[in-house]
Amino acid sequence: MARQRVGLLFGGKSGEHDVSIVSAAAIAKAFAQEDNPDKYELLPFYIDRNGIWHDPEISQQVLTAGKALPVETVDPASRWQFPPAAPSIDAWFPIVHGPNGEDGTLQGLLTLMEKPFVGSKVLGSAAGMDKLAMKMVFAQAGLAQVDYVGVLRSEVWSGPCVFPKVCDKIEAQLDYPMFVKPANLGSSVGISKVRTRDELEKALDLAAEYDRRLIVEAGVTAREVECAVLGNDQPKASVVGEIRFDSDFYDYETKYTDGKSSMHIPAEIPGAIAQQIQELAIKAFQALDCRGIARVDFFYVEATQTVLINEINTLPGFTALSMYPQLWQQSGVPFPQLVDRLVQFALEDVPQA
């Protein structure tokens, strides 16, 4: 049987460009293991910081280096052209994190190309990327979550007459400490923990540099636990894992620096709580109409034995430090089998004519 060509898409214009490269390198390694080389021919496609797609030869150099390489100046018109090898792809494996990668825009392009691809479609990707939209869906689905307030960049940068009133509104609804986040960035980019009015104002200004939609969440004393989901209409949940860290919160540096945080799989929590988290993870996955892959993050409030959903990530990281592949490893699905299953779920999710 002829091997199927899988296009590995990585890089992109977002602040998570470097994380995407590391994830792609790990995925490429998994495709070279077990019987995957007999089933798939992997072709990498690197999208540079200018949004230009590069052919497999240059893309492989980026994968090998594990970081962005200086590339020759390309005609700007080529930004709208696919590399010659692109039309031959049977299925795409996008691992472009952040805006224009996991927010439905790239998924829309792949849909127009009429090719199967790993992960959620436009709806699930868009709702899963925007934390405000996500929380509205969670609320509609009856999923318990922390209190929050949505803010627009225009309110933050409105001047001395309006901005203080915005902060007053936030303080009236939430107690310190709070977390201020851009609504559409992952990997903890642009997030601040605030304890005072002055810190709140500065954090809002910082978050507004990254996004026009912001979210302020109430702080909660809880353990951070995560559950991976795999599948389409009958998704399965992995064992539950826990993230432990010594820093004030799980920021970008803590997340991607060796020794800054540790994973505990399975999490040392009561069996009934673990089962509840698995059920809630699947419920969240289905509420957003996710496909193939997602990681769902929760707060486990030990004092009250309650579980609050934090967020869903429809395109979680695949680096050596990433929770998603490790959760499945501990659930009996090694990395090479995981990428194989994801491609198979993508192939089966093609509408029948």
From Swiss-Prot:
Positions with a binding annotation for Mg(2+) 1: D297, E311
Catalytic EC class: ligase
Localization terms from the record: Cytoplasm
Pathway this chain belongs to: Cell wall biogenesis; peptidoglycan biosynthesis
GO biological process, alphabetically ordered: cell wall organization; peptidoglycan biosynthetic process; regulation of cell shape
PROSITE patterns per the UniProt record, alphabetical: ATP_GRASP (PS50975), DALA_DALA_LIGASE_1 (PS00843), DALA_DALA_LIGASE_2 (PS00844)
Enzyme Commission code(s) on record: 6.3.2.4
Residues that hold Mg(2+) 2 according to the record: E311, N313
Reaction(s) catalysed (UniProt annotation): 2 D-alanine + ATP = D-alanyl-D-alanine + ADP + phosphate + H(+)
Family to which the UniProt record says this protein belongs: Belongs to the D-alanine--D-alanine ligase family.
Annotated function: Cell wall formation.
Protein's name in the database: D-alanine--D-alanine ligase
Originating species: Picosynechococcus sp. (strain ATCC 27264 / PCC 7002 / PR-6) (Agmenellum quadruplicatum)
Originating gene: ddl
